[in-house]
């Protein structure tokens, strides 16, 4: 299917996948650091931003992963395997593509799917529902209310450790997306299951904000079981959407995670 997207920069292709209720603009703060070194593709997931929500079957997660896999192939030049990075739901999608061996590498920022049990998943989805309920209560007064920092900053605090980094226009767009998104209500039905056999040859990087209030950092301990090859790091002082909290740091993590394999091997050899 065709998904709304933007392409900029040059170098190895790096596809960036946002989280649930977000938009491809979630990555805007990184583009200046990434595009001199990567051909960056930012995409709106189905039912997000400018991408339409297709008719969904019983396996919503599998359908999303297949749609993104098809999209990645469409936007990647012939003869190249793309690198993929994602945040939250986008992080899980990136890891799923790595598990299937569909991509050159995967970098996941506070990825979904590592809930310690079903109650943990319920807690995460109910957090989104509570935030959406608050935004809906504001109704037509939402644009005016968000102009006040005393309202805007607390409204964003679940997602960002530093909500002051989010401008008014972006905050309004994000809140409207939260209100209108239809996938949140399917969150409890989503099956976060990896293939029985995970490709261990695909490089994986997982970075988790220590101040993540949506998907707490304790979930990170579950990453190594399915991805023993993963480079796992905890990021002090960063929240669920770390791209906005610390653009330069996250850019460096994405560049390192998507380093071509040959260069990666040389770096390791030199370090040794």
PLM region spans:
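Catalytic active-site module of serine/aspartate enzymes centered on a nucleophile-bearing elbow/loop
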Residues: 229-272
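Active-site loop/oxyanion-hole signature of alpha/beta-hydrolase fold enzymes
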Residues: 2, 8, 41-89, 252
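Conserved HGGG/HGGXW glycine-rich cap/lid loop of the alpha/beta-hydrolase fold
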Residues: 6-53
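Conserved catalytic-core motifs of eukaryotic protein kinase domains, centered on the activation segment
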Residues: 26-28, 51-57, 117-120, 217-218
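Conserved serine/cysteine hydrolase catalytic core
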Residues: 180-225, 234
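Flexible "cap/lid" loop of the alpha/beta hydrolase fold
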Residues: 103-139
């Amino acid at each position: 299917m065709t998904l709304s997207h933007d392409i900029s920069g040059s170098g190895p292709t790096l596809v960036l996948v946002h989280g649930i209720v977000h938009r491809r603009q979630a990555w805007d703060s990184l583009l200046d650091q990434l595009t001199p070194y990567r051909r960056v593709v930012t995409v709106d997931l189905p039912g997000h931003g400018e991408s339409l929500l297709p008719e969904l079957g019983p396996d919503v997660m599998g359908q999303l992963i297949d749609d993104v896999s098809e999209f990645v192939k469409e936007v990647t030049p012939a003869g190249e395997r793309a690198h993929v990075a994602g945040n939250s739901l986008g992080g899980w999608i990136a890891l799923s593509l790595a598990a299937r061996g569909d991509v050159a590498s995967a970098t996941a920022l506070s990825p979904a799917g590592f809930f310690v049990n079903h109650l943990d998943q319920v807690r995460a989805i109910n957090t989104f529902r509570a935030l959406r309920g608050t935004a809906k209560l504001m109704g037509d007064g939402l644009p005016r209310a968000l102009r006040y920092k005393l309202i805007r900053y607390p409204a964003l605090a679940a997602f960002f450790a530093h909500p002051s980094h989010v401008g008014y226009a972006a905050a309004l767009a994000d809140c409207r997306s939260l209100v209108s998104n239809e996938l949140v209500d399917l969150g409890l039905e989503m099956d976060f299951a990896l293939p029985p056999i995970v490709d261990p040859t695909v490089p994986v990087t997982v970075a988790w904000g220590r101040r993540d209030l949506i998907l707490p950092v304790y979930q990170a301990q579950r990453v190594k079981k399915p991805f023993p090859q993963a480079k796992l790091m905890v990021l002090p002082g960063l929240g669920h959407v770390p791209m906005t909290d610390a653009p330069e740091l996250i850019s460096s993590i994405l560049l390192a995670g998507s380093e071509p394999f040959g260069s990666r091997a040389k770096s390791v050899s030199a370090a040794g």
